[in-house]
Amino acid sequence: MFIGMKSSSQLRQEALEYTYNANTPLKIYLKVCVSILDKAQLEFQKGDIFSAYVLYYRYADLIANKLSDHSELALVAERDQTVLHREEYYQLVKLELPAVLKIVEDLQKNIDLDYNKIQLSLSKNIAKQQKKPNHVSEPVLLPKTFNENRFNQSISFFNNMNSNITLENKMHGNNNNNTHQELLYPELPTLSNASYI
């Protein structure tokens, strides 16, 4: 039974989702209580504190809230079996229930601490994602002296020169990196409003 990351209040709601029938004999519910407690301890030993919390809480609710009103507890002892089951119930209330309530309390603290850490981490991640600005490129204003045709010719010349150098190196088998080839860069526009001029 994997519960996942939920708050203790969500887990409590889940723990209370079970069917109780007041007409079911007390001895059956006592066996159910022992079974729930065994499963809770097994889940706790496996490290699944969420499932363990649900089962321990369900056990405590069944013992303290549901079975306390069971009709066999109110009957005057007519049979030895009824007396035996009643005594077993009162032993559970006296001996096991306080220990289980302490376990529930400790597990609740751990679950709430983990849940709050995860919620804080998630909220920080969401805040980081919202803070990232959308990079919208603004149009670049070119200086009035910029000549687009001349710039494109320079780029074309540069590309042709580089392809010619690469072709010559391949033809002559000259792959030596020590050979110095002069590279020509395109002429860039002069900025008239530059602050460093």
Swiss-Prot record:
Cellular component, GO, one term: endosome
State whether keyword Ribosomal protein applies. no
Q: Which InterPro entries match?
A: USP8_dimer (IPR015063)
Compartmental location: Endosome
Alphabetical UniProt keywords: Endosome, Protease inhibitor, Thiol protease inhibitor
Q: Give the Gene Ontology MF terms in alphabetical order.
A: cysteine-type endopeptidase inhibitor activity
Instruction: Write out the GO biological process terms.
Output: ubiquitin recycling
Q: What's this chain's function?
A: Inhibitor of the DOA4 deubiquitinase involved in the regulation of protein degradation by the proteasome and maintenance of a normal level of free ubiquitin.
Q: Which family does it belong to?
A: Belongs to the RFU1 family.
Q: What is this protein called?
A: Regulator of free ubiquitin chains 1
Question: Species lineage, top-down?
Answer: Eukaryota, Fungi, Dikarya, Ascomycota, Saccharomycotina
